[in-house]
Amino acid sequence: TYQLSTVNTFFTGMSNGGELCYLLACEAPNIFRAFAPVAGTIFPNGLTNNICSSTFPVAIFETHGRNDNVTLFQGDPFDQYWGPYLGIDTIINFWVDHNSLTDLVVDTFPNLNNNNKITISYKYSASTTNNEVWLYTHKSGHNWGDDGDVVIEEEIWDFFSKMSLNQSTFIEENYQSSRLIKVVDILGRKSNEKQNSLLFYIYDDGTVEKKIIFE
């Protein structure tokens, strides 16, 4: 078995994987340090059945397209396929209240490729907790939101890194005896070491090291 960190294990997924993120955030908030659902939602019975009644703080980073025609940004109380589900504003407000967050910083990423699929970030925090709730919205559809202005995979990694507890100590202790299994790029494809690229080094003890090798 992999020797996963007891304080720095994270979960991310898109669409149905995003719904799984929220389910685990409700049912296993003490197992995972933070969650990053992409184009996900919560079904109403997930709240009315009180599976999110735990007071355990939960760090959440949702990315969602305002033009998503599969999992509508505003939710759908009349969906006949999966069943009614909540809108993103309702979900984010739930987690903000859950974590007792009081501060909000809003920022707009430069639209570098002029495609008007502008990404806006909403970051909620508080001085009394290390947990945060982030929301990135973009004018695209049911996808990761990689529109050329933002690399969502890197933003998720930055979020997880910021939410990490004692990360540097954990990495230092484990890399001394771990064996490298493979190297992958940000899309999960196997890769050889190359310069000026973000790569992830995966070790046999379950740890992952992020590297950028400059010329």
Predicted regions and their residues:
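Gly/Ser-rich "nucleophile elbow"/oxyanion-hole loop immediately N-terminal to the catalytic nucleophile
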Residues: 1-16, 26-31
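Residue-level detector of functionally pivotal "anchor" positions at catalytic/ligand-binding pockets or at interdomain
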Residues: 104, 162-190
